[in-house]
Structure formats: structure tokens, C-alpha cells
Amino acid sequence: RDLVRSRGLGDVYKRQAMHGVGDSLGPQLMAELGDVTRFTHRNAITAFAGVDPGADQSGTHEAKSTRVSKSGPPELRRALFLVMDCLLKTMPQDDPVYRFMDKKRAEGKPYLVYMTAGANKFLRIYYGRVKEYLASLEGN
């Protein structure tokens, strides 16, 4: 918390508060992701975190189900899985990430599949909110 205040990121941290992200996971996610503006699009942030489906194609063959790429820092994936675990324990019905994971779980998807899909969706929403906030700062 003190790190966030000392860096002048308290306003960003407070505005971007999402379910499952608290006093310890918020700064950890911000530290692991770094400057969000360096990612050109939302798929770049999920690729960096390693929660995007890996490509498996050659010629006319294209696999429908592939493993996660697992590129990027494992600490970031660990923090994302902790956020997903918090979402599953608190069950916030108004959270789009929880609803998405609950839908995947109801479809009978394996644990790692819906946790990884939830982390992917979380990052895409996080990226959008931070970019929107930074754009509003530039407008002022």
C-alpha cells in the first residue's frame, strides 16, 4: 500500500480496483505487468502473461484445443490464479470474470481451463480499464 502511495499510483489503484484484487495482489499485479501502455492491444498483455492459447497449426491442420503458452513471468500467472481463486471463494455475482468462469465451470470444463480463461478475461478487462483511465487523464 505504501509503495502505491509513494509512487503516486494510489488514484489508479483505487479506480482500477477489481474483485479479487486487494492490498497485496494489486501492487503485485501492477509490478509484474509494469507499464500497461507498452502493450499495443489486449491480446499482447495476455500473451505476455502466458494465459493465451498456444498456436498449433501447420498447413491445413489447425488444432482446436491447445495448451497455454506459459510465456512470461510465472509470478504473474501465480498472482492471476490467486485473483481467480478469490473470485471463486467470494462469488461476486456482479463481476463479469466470475460469471464467465462460473459459466465455463457449468459447461464441465476442467479446473485449469476455466481458471486460465478467467485470467485471460481478467487481463483484457484490466487492460481496457487502465487504458480508459489513462486516456481520460490525457483529455484533462
Question: Predicted segment positions?
Answer:
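Single conserved hydrophobic/aromatic residue that forms the stacking wall/gate
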Residues: 1-13
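Low-complexity, acidic/Ser/Thr- and charged residue-rich accessory regions of DNA metabolism proteins
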Residues: 60-64, 98-140
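Residue-level micro-sites within transmembrane alpha helices that shape
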Residues: 4, 76-77, 120
